Amino acid sequence: MWFSGKKEQTIISLFFKHIDKVEETLKCVFDLIKKYLEDTDDIESLYLRTQRLESEADRLRRKTEMEMYSGAFLPNFRGDLLGLIESVDKVANKAEYVADLIVLQKPEVPHELKDLILSQMEYSLKAYESLKSALKFLFEDLERVEEFVLAVEKYEHDEDAVERTALRKLFEMDIERSVKLEVKELIRSIGDIADRTEDVSDRAEIILLKRRF
């Protein structure tokens, strides 16, 4: 680890806790989606857990930011890290939004699209897991960061391909327009999780380049 100060170590520990909590949020939303697509009514507990996890992630973000304002890190890196934290939190925000869509709107997802939507979420989760590794290696082993940045790009690309297929199938279906629009929003929003994950990965790559040069 290339930071040894006590303040810096505290912040890095909080940062790791934050990215872990966001991963918990994503996994909970994935479980909620699976339950919903299985036509079960038992999603309320998962919805409440999603809200709790996202709130915990938010508190960790704020705590990390407050610690950073105490003067830890050089100003340039401090700004980069703040940007990372905010971007990671947006991933959790979008995941919670997906849960809101499902619980509040209850979109009528056609059977033909269920596996595609699950694949979207699987790729989004794999992208985030790769991102988490990239972010941890950013502080532990810079040489390992790039392989996980590339993995994020791959999984985001895979998700995007599934998303396009799902949307194409959706609009070929003979169903009510209102249903199409609700399902479209769900598909797009899951895609946004992968997109936001890649946005964080791009920030990590920029920090990597700065550290190298």
Swiss-Prot record:
Superkingdom, taxonomy of origin: Bacteria
Short name of one Pfam family: PhoU_div
Family stated for the protein in its record: Belongs to the UPF0111 family.
Name of the protein this chain belongs to: UPF0111 protein TM_0914
Organism annotation: Thermotoga maritima (strain ATCC 43589 / DSM 3109 / JCM 10099 / NBRC 100826 / MSB8)
